[in-house]
């Protein structure tokens, strides 16, 4: 990071969006001494949001996602930029570039792995050289999966053969998340969606790992929990992130295991529930893969809208990890969270 005095410790970009508003209120409530600001293109909306903050009212910075000068100004006056401006492949490319140039760390909550792959290809070497941290996917996608796997391995202090993660939870979906799903199918490299090691460095996985890491679509009984597994909608995002983390640790001689394999599923109590979820995901996949998918977009939640406060408060998530080690032992670890996983918990 460039050695310069900065006005703020944190700037939230895209603060007036659905998830950005939640983050703004959270920061105001929990960090009364933080030097921070909220940023976006609409001054009136930013002022209205800032006026809702009663403990630590943020400053306001104007910045449009298509205006490089404004974005670079934002990056030059803060240590960290936290972006909620999705779809990120449309609205955060210039922001990441400005953060890299101005020496500000960048974080977001994207689940758009194809876009993340582009970030890695374009910026990884420069970010490493400049000491800038570019950290996508810092929400429910993919923190529980990534951190849960990390702490599972570190707490055992053993080399691992495999981790199977089973996700369950309750909550809602915002229009921005749905828009991101539609957007990714229109992205220039959408044909890479099935690449199970999309985010890995070159030559960082074996044929055995590739064979055991194929995306899973079947329904199975989970003997350890007496429940059922189904395909998890965010597994294609989370698995790629965990596999990249494992590969990066391995490059630093501190890996999870030489042939480490990670897979992820949804956990449900009943077979019928697993069947319904699996069928629904197939239908959703067909809808967003159709050439005329945009005709179906009005059927879903609009950008800017999302779960009610009651739904967010009553939401929850559980991440369960079945870990098999190289000494042929099996362990179980669990992670819990209160609040809607994609919003309040995030």
Question: Where do the model's predicted regions map?
Answer:
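Glycine-/Pro-rich loop/turn segments that contact NAD(P) or position catalytic residues
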Residues: 87-204
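Conserved glycine-rich Rossmann-like NAD(P)H-binding loop of the short-chain dehydrogenase/reductase
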Residues: 32-45
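N-terminal Rossmann NAD(P)H-binding glycine-rich loop of SDR-like oxidoreductase domains
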Residues: 8-31
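C-terminal catalytic/substrate-binding lobe primarily of soluble NAD(P)-dependent oxidoreductases
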Residues: 7, 154-346
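Structural motif
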Residues: 9, 79-80, 105
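Short, conserved SAM-binding/catalytic segment
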Residues: 49-56
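A short, basic/flexible loop-to-alpha-helix module at the beginning of a structural domain
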Residues: 1-7
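Conserved Rossmann-fold cofactor-binding substructure of NAD(P)-dependent oxidoreductases
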Residues: 62-91
């Amino acid at each position: 990071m460039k050695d310069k005095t900065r006005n703020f410790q944190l700037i939230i970009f895209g603060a007036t969006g659905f998830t950005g508003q939640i983050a703004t209120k959270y920061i105001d409530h929990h960090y009364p001494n933080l030097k921070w600001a909220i940023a976006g293109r609409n001054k009136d909306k930013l002022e209205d949001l800032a006026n809702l903050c009663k403990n630590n009212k943020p400053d306001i910075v104007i910045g449009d996602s298509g205006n490089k000068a404004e974005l670079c100004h934002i990056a030059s006056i803060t240590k960290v930029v936290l972006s909620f401006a999705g779809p990120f492949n449309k609205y955060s490319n210039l922001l990441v570039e400005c953060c890299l140039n101005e020496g500000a760390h960048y974080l977001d909550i994207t689940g758009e792995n194809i876009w993340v792959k582009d970030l890695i290809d374009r910026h990884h070497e420069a970010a490493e050289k400049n000491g800038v941290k570019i950290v996508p996917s810092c929400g429910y996608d993919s923190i529980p999966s990534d951190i849960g796997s990390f702490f599972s391995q570190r707490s055992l202090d053993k080399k691992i053969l495999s981790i199977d993660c089973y996700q369950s939870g309750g909550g809602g979906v915002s229009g921005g998340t749905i828009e991101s799903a539609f957007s990714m199918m229109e992205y220039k490299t959408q044909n890479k969606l099935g690449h199970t090691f999309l985010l890995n460095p070159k030559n960082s996985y074996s044929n055995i790992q590739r064979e055991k890491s194929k995306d899973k679509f079947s329904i199975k009984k989970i003997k350890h929990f007496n429940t059922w597994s189904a395909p998890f909608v965010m597994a294609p995002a989370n698995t790629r992130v965990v596999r990249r983390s494992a590969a990066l640790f391995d490059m630093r001689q501190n890996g999870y295991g030489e042939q480490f394999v990670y897979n992820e599923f949804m956990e449900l109590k009943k077979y019928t529930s697993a069947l319904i979820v699996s069928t629904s995901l197939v239908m959703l996949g067909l809808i967003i893969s159709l050439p005329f998918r945009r005709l179906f977009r009005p059927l879903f939640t609009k950008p800017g809208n999302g779960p009610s406060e009651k739904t967010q408060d009553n939401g929850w998530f559980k991440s369960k990890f079945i870990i098999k080690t190289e000494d042929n032992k099996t362990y179980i670890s669990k992670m819990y969270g209160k609040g809607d996983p994609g919003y309040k918990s995030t």
